[in-house]
Amino acid sequence: MKVIKRSGTTQEYDGKKITSAMQKAFDSVGQTCRQEVLRDLLSQVEQNLGEGPHTVEAIQDMVERILMANGYYDVAKSYILYRQKRTELRSARMELADAVKEEGFGKILLEIQRDFPEEEYGLHLLYNKFSGFRKSDLTIHEILNALIKAAVELTTSEAPKWEYIAARFLNYQFGLELAQELKKRGIGSFYDKLRYLTDKELYGAYVLERYSRQEIEQAEAFLDPQRDKLFTYAGLDLLLKRYVIRSHHGAPLETPQEMYLGIALHLAMEEKENRMDWVKRFYDMLSRMEVTMATPTLSNARKPYHQLSSCFIDTVPDDLTGIYRSIDNFAQVSKFGGGMGLYFGKVRATGSSIRGFDGAAGGVIRWIKLVNDTAVAVDQLGMRQGAVAVYLDAWHKDLPEFLQLRTNNGDDRMKAHDVFPAVCYPDLFWKLAEEDLNHEWHLLCPHDVLTVKGYALEDFYGEEWERRYLDCVRDPRIPKRTVTVKDIVRLVLKSAVETGTPFAFNRDTVNRANPNGHRGIIYCSNLCTEIAQNMAPIESVSTEIRTGEGDTVVVTTTRPGELVVCNLASLVLGNIPVEDDSYLHELVGTVVRALDNVIDLNFYPLPYAKITNRRYRSIGLGVSGYHHMLARRGISWESEEHLAFVDKVFERINHAAIEASTELSREKGCYDFFEGSDWQTGAYFKKRGYDTPEWKELADKVAAQGMRNAYLLAVAPTSSTSILAGTTAGLDPIMKRFFLEEKKGSMLPRVAPELSIKTYWYYKNAHLIDQRWSVRACGVRQRHIDQAQSVNLYITNDYTMRQVLELYLLAWRSGVKTIYYVRSRSLEVEECESCAS
């Protein structure tokens, strides 16, 4: 039998569609209907219809009559209402398709009806909203803008999926624009596109130099446009504006899926075996939104200037040449979109001597002001100003002024509003704060200590640091600036509440857990407080004049020190089946390999960073979608269940990452300083209480095979890449379940991921959460993270200074290494783009 569709086309009759519609009608009135009854009703319909062909309406009319003839009046009524509703939806769909009049748009609307069948996503609602924005003589682009705006405005906490519908319209609009640009340039295949982009210096020539045409065509077959449906409107809007390749005049030249494939091609470029398999695995993990790479990797992979690293950390030495070199290093890093951490703990304090002249030194503040001006001046091609965190030790003589760098009162000549201050705390400071805030606290100049004692106090930690610090305090030859612990705490908390900073770095906790303590010390962290790796200042060796072949040159020789660089990626926990151990291990293994490849493929803005990165081969695998993961499993943030669950999850992630790194070491070789490390001795595993047979087996494997990477895990804030993946940022709880954000004249819906009746109450707002649970959870996770975590504290106006201090003390007692922002409810803070993995 043939069926005549409303469009006039015919198709084969399918009785299953009729039984499905009748079943829904029975369900809608709360009646159960056995399959044999449905089959009998269908048989009656078919007998009464005869051979056909029949229109859809004629078949539906017959279904109504048969239902009533068999006494199912309520069911028939429901079926009639169902038909009426379908007619309304069809009418709305036809009106919308007629408004756009572009090929393929009707299919988009049909898919939306199929994928979002709930009443609150009816196209008649969209049409009614769209009609209010519609005007005569609109272009296709303007009509689609109106449709997108309508879908965005329909997005609410009760109907959150409209943000996915808005994304589909945006993607369709982008596709039309892209198709025009490709046609104009005569681009057909993916290979043609790469050839064109390479010729225009928008793609790195290295891609086509490494891959054959056949391999590019094989890669093109990996593309899955259906994965565009995973984007929310906010995520797709961000990706199209910031990440896809555009011409020098802003014309789009790459689809979202081609962007992910281009990144995968770059990251797998140097694989010796099964290279195309790795291309597919890298593409799949990115396009399925199970993993996000850091913002510089997403932006710059596949391009001529492929600076893929997020953050850099430099130790500022105590000499004029070294200070200006560090500032220049920051400028070079900022130029290519990286963020910086600068450790100023070695720089002499205000009033210290220079070449024996007492009182000549101007202190760290004037140098930090130069860093501040550099951040403003080197603004990444006018896109955004540079970002830098400046770290100072809690015993440094300039600390009181340092803690007022960003506050609103005081001498403006001593301010630096565009840097992010951070303080490095020894255990002794917190011990005294816990015991009695009136304890004396002695501030010292590092140059005075070095001159009198012959050692740098900051080069030690733990009990040895405390012994030497107290010895310096007792030594009358060393000038001191004596305050109380309360004085420092008051300045810290005042600045934290006003500005969100200083960040906190618990140096003894960090260095005790350092798996590479045999090679040095960790002075500070990076811009986003998640990196903790060995550091050493760059040293000038000599400057000489050389003449040869009629030319004179000045040659400066330096020792590279250890300038830290971090390559980041994040597991999107909300999109991963974290309970599936084999799936998690395979995914972690894939992303660890990708990050390890970044080290060799990277364009380094500084030669010092290249040397450190290739010696240590450090990576920073983190997570995003943490609150998303908890909510979709019905786990309350403020619960012991939360702590127990994440303890297991992060232990499995750590196990998988270590296993991946040791297997890479077996395949490609271990990092330079493995011998003598905690990895090699087994101390890493003992310190963390990893004593199960499974862990002992892994420890033995590591000792035998080595580790490819000196450092593995670091949890970045992921402020922008979490938007791309449609998940919650980093380890943070959500700010609100739903809100509309205005950006450059347009409204962006922000909805908690998978918001529904089931998840609603598990999405508690960050400022309403008891922060002690957040700190305790951070302590639980920290055992499994060899570096650190970007963790924010959320406070309200009801918090007393004592309560905020208690959170810092709890963090220290819980083994938390760093604290990022203190987010007061009324405070707006600037996010780091570079670490947004």
Task: Indicate where each model-derived feature is located.
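Gly/Pro-rich turn-and-neighbor structural signature
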Residues: 251-321, 468-495, 499-504, 649-700
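Internal maturation/activation junctions in enzymes
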Residues: 285, 303, 327, 587-610, ...
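Core nucleic-acid recognition elements
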Residues: 9, 32-261, 277-283
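Long, structured ligand/cofactor-binding scaffold of large enzymes
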Residues: 141, 146, 177-182, 230-232, ...
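Catalytic alpha/beta core of large soluble enzyme barrels
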Residues: 212-220, 224, 228-237, 529-533, ...
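Active-site cavity-forming subdomains of large catalytic enzyme subunits
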Residues: 172-226, 309-560, 564-570, 577-578, ...
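Terminal amphipathic helices with adjacent charged low-complexity linkers/tails
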Residues: 78-79, 83-88, 162-194, 425, ...
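Core structural elements
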Residues: 65-68, 138, 153, 231-241, ...
